[in-house]
From Swiss-Prot:
This is Probable DNA ligase. PROSITE patterns: DNA_LIGASE_A1, DNA_LIGASE_A3. Its EC number is 6.5.1.1. It comes from Pseudarthrobacter chlorophenolicus (strain ATCC 700700 / DSM 12829 / CIP 107037 / JCM 12360 / KCTC 9906 / NCIMB 13794 / A6) (Arthrobacter chlorophenolicus). Gene3D superfamilies: DNA ligase, ATP-dependent, N-terminal domain (1.10.3260.10), DNA ligase/mRNA capping enzyme (3.30.470.30), Nucleic acid-binding proteins (2.40.50.140). It comes from the Bacteria. GO terms for molecular function: ATP binding; DNA binding; DNA ligase (ATP) activity; metal ion binding. Pfam families: DNA_ligase_A_C, DNA_ligase_A_M, DNA_ligase_A_N. Keywords: ATP-binding, Cell cycle, Cell division, DNA damage, DNA recombination, DNA repair, DNA replication, Ligase, Magnesium, Metal-binding, Nucleotide-binding. It catalyses: ATP + (deoxyribonucleotide)n-3'-hydroxyl + 5'-phospho-(deoxyribonucleotide)m = (deoxyribonucleotide)n+m + AMP + diphosphate. InterPro entries: ATP-dep_DNA_ligase, DNA_ligae_ATP-dep_bac/arc, DNA_ligase_ATP-dep, DNA_ligase_ATP-dep_C, DNA_ligase_ATP-dep_cent, DNA_ligase_ATP-dep_CS, DNA_ligase_ATP-dep_N, DNA_ligase_N_sf.
Length: 507
C-alpha cells in the first residue's frame, strides 16, 4: 500500500469528531491492507510505530528535509524498512548513515508524507486513531466482536499482531489468545481524582497505596528465567539484574508481577526520576541501584488471577513478596486515606493510588477502579512560539512553546526566557481560536510549521513536576504539562522563573 493512502486516512480521522466516522474510515483502510503491512500500519495509526524511538531528533529531522517528491510513490513497507534501519544504527559512522537514510526517506516523500514521517520520528504524531477507536475498527473490518479483539489485544500486549490474527485467522484462534508467562500484557491504568475523599466515594473500600515516582515494570518468572518489561512492553531484563535477583528469591515457580522500580537514597527517600530512567538507556551505567516494589500479581504457579478480586491478589502478593509490597492499607475511611496520602508525600513520593478491593485486573484499560490522587502544581509561563496544528486543528495555532523567566541570565540573556517544554493539552476550541488570532498579531518570525512571537503572553500551566533534560538550555523539561488558561492580568515580567522550576528537582 502507498503511504499516501494511510496518511490521507489519518488526516480524515483526525479531522472528524465522529467516532463512527473514524471507525468506518479505519476499517475500510484495514480491509485494503496487505497482511504483511498490518502490524506496521497499526503501529503508525496509533502513533506508536513498532520500532519505538529510533534516535532521531528535531535537528536531524530538519536537516534531512529537502524538496518533497511531486507524486506519491513511497510505500508503507518502504517506511517500515527505513525505521528498521534507523533503529539498528549504532556505533562509529552511524550518524552519517542515519542522516543518509533520513535524506533518502524524505526525498521520496511528498510534502504531506514528510510531515507525517516527521511526526513519527519525533514522537509528535497525532493521528486521531486512539487504540480504542482502532480496536473497534479492527473488529468491524474482521467481522469479529469488539470484546474478542480487545481481550486478545490486552492479553497479547500487541494490537498489531491481534489485528493480523483477527483479519487473517479464525474466530476460534482469536478467542484462544490468553495470558502466558513470558509474554507481557498491557498494564491496567488509573483515572485521576481530585482528592482521596472523592476517590473513595467512587471506589468504596480501597487499597490506598503510595504512588511512587518510578518506572512501571511487569516481571515474568518461569523457574529461574526472569524477564522484565516496561509499561510500553519493551524488554529491559538485561538492564535490571538486581531486580532479576530479587524476583528469583521469591518462593514461586511461575509468576507475573506488576509494579514499579526506582532509585532510593541512603535515607530511603526516592531519588530524581531521571536517575531511575538513566538505567533504561542504551548506554546506561549501573552506578544507580534500582529497588523493585510490587502492587499486583496476575499469575502464580498455573493460576491466572486476572479475574480474581484485588483483595485476593493482594493476599497472594503479600504471601510471596512481603518485603517488596508497595506501602499501603485497605480502608474505606477518608481520614485513614488522608493520613496515608500525607505520609506518602512526606516520604518524597508523588501521592497515592486508591484501588477498589473488588476490582478485577483490566489489562490495558483505564477506569474508575484505580484512581491516582496527587497534588497539582501550576506555574505562570510565557509563550515563546506556537506550532500550526494538524487534523482537526489544521489552520489553527496549537502546540505552545513555553518559557520561564531567567532574571539573572543564568541560562541566557538576563531578563530573557528559557524554553522548558511544549504542550497542546487542555486547549479548548475557544482558546485555539483566540491564540491563533493573537499570536499572528505579535509574530516576529516564522520557521517551518512554527510562529515565533513576542514573549509577552502569560499562560497558566499545570504540571506533575519537572525532569532533567538536555533538550533545553535550562536542562529541565516539564512533565505532563497542560493549559489551565491565559493570564491576561499578568505581565511576562511576573512569570515564574527557571530557578523556581529547577528547585522542583530532587537534590
Amino acid at each position: 500500500m502507498l503511504l499516501d493512502e494511510l496518511v490521507r486516512t489519518t488526516d480524515a480521522v483526525a479531522s472528524t469528531r465522529s467516532r463512527l466516522a473514524k471507525v468506518d474510515a479505519l476499517a475500510q483502510l484495514l480491509k485494503r491492507l496487505d497482511p504483511a503491512d498490518i502490524p506496521a500500519a497499526v503501529g503508525l495509526l496509533t502513533a506508536k510505530p513498532r520500532q519505538g524511538r529510533v534516535g532521531v531528533g528535531w535537528r536531524g529531522m530538519s536537516a534531512a528535509m529537502g524538496e518533497p517528491a511531486a507524486d506519491p510513490g513511497l510505500t508503507l513497507a518502504d517506511l517500515d524498512a527505513a525505521l528498521d534501519r534507523l533503529q539498528a544504527l549504532a556505533g562509529a559512522g552511524s550518524a552519517a548513515e542515519r542522516a543518509a537514510t533520513l535524506r533518502g526517506l524524505t526525498a521520496a516523500a511528498t510534502e504531506r508524507e514528510q510531515a507525517f514521517i516527521g511526526g513519527v520520528l519525533l514522537g509528535e504524531l497525532r493521528t486521531g486513531a486512539l487504540e480504542g477507536v482502532l480496536t473497534d475498527a479492527v473488529a468491524r473490518a474482521a467481522e469479529r466482536s469488539v470484546e474478542a479483539v480487545r481481550r486478545a489485544a490486552m492479553l497479547s500486549g500487541d494490537l498489531g499482531s491481534t489485528a493480523l490474527l483477527a483479519l487473517t485467522g479464525t474466530a476460534a484462534e482469536l478467542d484462544a489468545v490468553g495470558l502466558k508467562v513470558g509474554r507481557p500484557v498491557q498494564p491496567m491504568l488509573a483515572g485521576t481524582g481530585a482528592s482521596v475523599t472523592a476517590a473513595l466515594e467512587t471506589t468504596g473500600e480501597a487499597s490506598v497505596e503510595y504512588k511512587l515516582d518510578g518506572a512501571r515494570i511487569q516481571v515474568h518468572r518461569s523457574g529461574g528465567d526472569v524477564r522484565i518489561f516496561t509499561r510500553t512492553l519493551a524488554e529491559v531484563t538485561h538492564r535490571l539484574p538486581e531486580v532479576v535477583e530479587v524476583v528469583r528469591g521469591f518462593p514461586v515457580h511461575d509468576v507475573i508481577l506488576d509494579g514499579e522500580t526506582l532509585a532510593l537514597g541512603e535515607d530511603g527517600a526516592p531519588r530524581p526520576f531521571q536517575e531511575t530512567m538513566s538505567r533504561f538507556g542504551a548506554d546506561a551505567a549501573r552506578t544507580t541501584v534500582l529497588h523493585p516494589w510490587f502492587f499486583d500479581v496476575l499469575h502464580i504457579d498455573g493460576r491466572d488471577l486476572l479475574d480474581e478480586p484485588l483483595s485476593e491478589r493482594i493476599k497472594v502478593l503479600e504471601a510471596i513478596a512481603p518485603a517488596h509490597r508497595i506501602p499501603g492499607e485497605i480502608t474505606a475511611d477518608p481520614e485513614v486515606a488522608g493520613r496515608i496520602s500525607r505520609d506518602a508525600l512526606a516520604a518524597g513520593h508523588e501521592g497515592v493510588m486508591l484501588k477498589s478491593v473488588g476490582s478485577l485486573y483490566a489489562a490495558g484499560r483505564r477506569g474508575s477502579n484505580w484512581i491516582k490522587v496527587k497534588p497539582v502544581l501550576t506555574y505562570d509561563l510565557v509563550v515563546l512560539a506556537c506550532e500550526w496544528g494538524s487534523g482537526r486543528r489544521t489552520g489553527m495555532l496549537s502546540n505552545l512553546h513555553l518559557g520561564a523567566l531567567d532574571p539573572a541570565g543564568e541560562y541566557g540573556e538576563p531578563g530573557g526566557y528559557v524554553m522548558v517544554g511544549k504542550t497542546f493539552k487542555g486547549l479548548t476550541d475557544a482558546l485555539l481560536q483566540w491564540q491563533t488570532k493573537r499570536f499572528q498579531e505579535i509574530e516576529v518570525r516564522r520557521t517551518a510549521g512554527t510562529v515565533w512571537v513576542e514573549p509577552v503572553t502569560v499562560v497558566e500551566i499545570a504540571i506533575d513536576g519537572v525532569q532533567q533534560s538536555p533538550r533545553y538550555p535550562g536542562r529541565i523539561a516539564l512533565r505532563f504539562a497542560r493549559v489551565k488558561g491565559y493570564r491576561e492580568d499578568k505581565t511576562a515580567a511576573e512569570a515564574d522563573t527557571i530557578q523556581t522550576l529547577r528547585a522542583l528537582l530532587r537534590p
